[in-house]
Protein backbone atom coordinates (compact mmCIF):
# COMPACT_ATOMS: atom_id res chain seq x y z
CA UNK A 1 0.00 0.00 0.00
CA UNK A 2 1.51 3.30 -1.01
CA UNK A 3 1.30 6.32 1.23
CA UNK A 4 0.08 9.48 -0.46
CA UNK A 5 0.91 13.04 0.60
CA UNK A 6 -1.95 15.18 1.84
CA UNK A 7 -3.82 17.33 -0.64
CA UNK A 8 -3.79 21.08 -0.09
CA UNK A 9 -7.28 20.89 1.46
CA UNK A 10 -6.33 17.98 3.74
CA UNK A 11 -3.19 19.83 4.82
CA UNK A 12 -5.16 22.98 5.64
CA UNK A 13 -7.70 20.97 7.66
CA UNK A 14 -4.91 19.18 9.54
CA UNK A 15 -3.17 22.44 10.39
CA UNK A 16 -6.44 23.92 11.64
CA UNK A 17 -6.83 20.91 13.94
CA UNK A 18 -3.21 21.20 15.17
CA UNK A 19 -2.88 24.90 16.04
CA UNK A 20 0.35 24.47 18.03
CA UNK A 21 2.17 22.87 15.12
CA UNK A 22 4.01 24.91 12.48
CA UNK A 23 4.05 24.05 8.79
CA UNK A 24 7.45 23.86 7.07
CA UNK A 25 6.69 24.51 3.40
CA UNK A 26 10.22 23.69 2.27
CA UNK A 27 10.04 20.18 3.71
CA UNK A 28 6.26 19.67 3.56
CA UNK A 29 6.42 18.86 7.27
CA UNK A 30 4.99 19.97 10.59
CA UNK A 31 6.98 20.79 13.70
CA UNK A 32 6.49 21.68 17.31
CA UNK A 33 8.64 22.37 20.36
CA UNK A 34 7.70 21.07 23.79
CA UNK A 35 9.10 22.38 27.06
CA UNK A 36 9.04 20.39 30.29
CA UNK A 37 10.01 21.14 33.90
CA UNK A 38 13.31 19.25 33.60
CA UNK A 39 15.31 16.71 31.61
CA UNK A 40 13.64 13.71 33.26
CA UNK A 41 10.18 14.89 32.21
CA UNK A 42 11.40 15.60 28.66
CA UNK A 43 13.02 12.18 28.41
CA UNK A 44 9.92 10.45 29.79
CA UNK A 45 7.87 12.18 27.07
CA UNK A 46 10.36 11.06 24.42
CA UNK A 47 10.08 7.50 25.69
CA UNK A 48 6.29 7.57 25.36
CA UNK A 49 6.58 8.97 21.84
CA UNK A 50 9.24 6.39 20.92
CA UNK A 51 6.99 3.52 22.01
CA UNK A 52 4.11 4.94 19.95
CA UNK A 53 6.41 5.47 16.95
CA UNK A 54 7.78 1.95 17.08
CA UNK A 55 4.31 0.43 17.40
CA UNK A 56 3.09 2.39 14.36
CA UNK A 57 6.34 2.12 12.38
CA UNK A 58 6.45 5.88 11.89
CA UNK A 59 9.32 7.77 13.46
CA UNK A 60 9.80 11.49 14.11
CA UNK A 61 12.83 13.61 13.45
CA UNK A 62 13.60 15.11 16.84
CA UNK A 63 16.16 16.60 19.15
CA UNK A 64 16.39 17.16 22.88
CA UNK A 65 18.31 19.73 24.87
CA UNK A 66 17.69 19.55 28.62
CA UNK A 67 13.96 20.29 29.07
CA UNK A 68 13.08 20.96 25.43
CA UNK A 69 12.04 18.48 22.74
CA UNK A 70 11.77 19.61 19.11
CA UNK A 71 9.79 17.33 16.80
CA UNK A 72 9.41 17.39 13.01
CA UNK A 73 7.02 15.06 11.20
CA UNK A 74 7.00 14.19 7.51
CA UNK A 75 6.56 10.95 5.60
CA UNK A 76 9.60 10.27 3.45
CA UNK A 77 7.85 7.46 1.53
CA UNK A 78 5.09 9.91 0.56
CA UNK A 79 7.45 12.76 -0.24
CA UNK A 80 5.81 15.01 2.34
CA UNK A 81 3.11 15.37 4.93
CA UNK A 82 0.69 12.43 5.12
CA UNK A 83 -2.18 11.18 7.25
CA UNK A 84 0.41 9.23 9.26
CA UNK A 85 2.01 12.51 10.37
CA UNK A 86 -1.32 13.99 11.38
CA UNK A 87 -2.21 10.88 13.40
CA UNK A 88 1.20 10.96 15.06
CA UNK A 89 0.93 14.67 15.89
CA UNK A 90 -2.47 14.03 17.48
CA UNK A 91 -1.00 11.14 19.51
CA UNK A 92 1.98 13.28 20.55
CA UNK A 93 -0.39 15.97 21.78
CA UNK A 94 -2.11 13.40 23.99
CA UNK A 95 1.22 11.99 25.20
CA UNK A 96 2.43 15.45 26.21
CA UNK A 97 -0.46 15.99 28.63
UniProtKB/Swiss-Prot annotation:
Name the keywords, alphabetized: Lyase
Keyword Lyase annotated: yes
Q: Which residues cross the membrane?
A: none
MF terms from GO for this chain are:
4-alpha-hydroxytetrahydrobiopterin dehydratase activity
EC assignment: the record states 4.2.1.96
* Cross-referenced Pfam families: Pterin_4a (PF01329)
Q: Does the keyword rRNA-binding apply?
A: no
- Give me any GO biological process, just one: tetrahydrobiopterin biosynthetic process
Q: Which reaction does it catalyse?
A: (4aS,6R)-4a-hydroxy-L-erythro-5,6,7,8-tetrahydrobiopterin = (6R)-L-erythro-6,7-dihydrobiopterin + H2O
Q: Which InterPro entries match?
A: PCD_sf (IPR036428), Pterin_deHydtase (IPR001533)
Q: According to its UniProt record, which protein family does this protein belong to? A: Belongs to the pterin-4-alpha-carbinolamine dehydratase family.
Protein name (record): Putative pterin-4-alpha-carbinolamine dehydratase
Q: Which organism is it from?
A: Rhizorhabdus wittichii (strain DSM 6014 / CCUG 31198 / JCM 15750 / NBRC 105917 / EY 4224 / RW1) (Sphingomonas wittichii)
Amino acid sequence: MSIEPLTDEERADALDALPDWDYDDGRDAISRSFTFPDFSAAFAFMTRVALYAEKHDHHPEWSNVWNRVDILLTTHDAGGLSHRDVAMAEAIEALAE
